[in-house]
Amino acid sequence: FVVRMINLADLERVLKGVTGRPRVVCAGSGATPLPLLDAVDRCLETWRFACVNAPVGVPTRKGVIHQTVFIGPGSRHAENLEYVPCRLSLAPRLYEDRFAPDILLLHTSTPHNGAVSMGIEVQVLPAALESAKRRGALVIAQVNPSMPYVFGDGIVDVDDIDIGVIVDT
C-alpha cells in the first residue's frame, strides 16, 4: 500500500491546515465515512458538504452547508441546505464545477493488487474522483477491512489516494 497511512489524530492535524471554506464530497447511504466527516467537522469552522442521500449522523450544525441533489435523512435537519434540482443521471456532471471537491472522502476496501474498491456504495463518486484529480484536491480514504472489494466503476488506483486512514466499522 503506497498511500500515506495515518491515524485519525494525525488526520486532524492535516485538516487543521486547510483554509477557506472547502467543499467536502463523500458517498451517502450505507458507505458514508462518518469517522472522517467527524474529523473534518472538528477541524473546520465552516465547510460545504456535497453528498447524495446523506444518512443520519452527518454534521448538521450551522457552519456546515449541505449541498445535494437528493435530500437524505441526514440533510433534512441541516441548518444550512442548498438543494439543486437535478435528475440523478445528470448529477455526475455537477462534480465538474458546481460540486467540485476540495476534499474527497472515500470509504474503501483494503488494497488488492494496487487498487481499492469503493465497495457497496459508488453513486457519483467516480465523477467526483476524476474532478478531484484534475483539480489537485485532497483525496482521503477510510480504509475499512470490513468493506468488500467489489469490481466495477468503484475501483480506485491507490496512486489516486493521498491519505489513508484505517477504520474498521
Locate the predicted segments by residue.
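Conserved alpha/beta enzyme-core scaffold
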Residues: 2-169
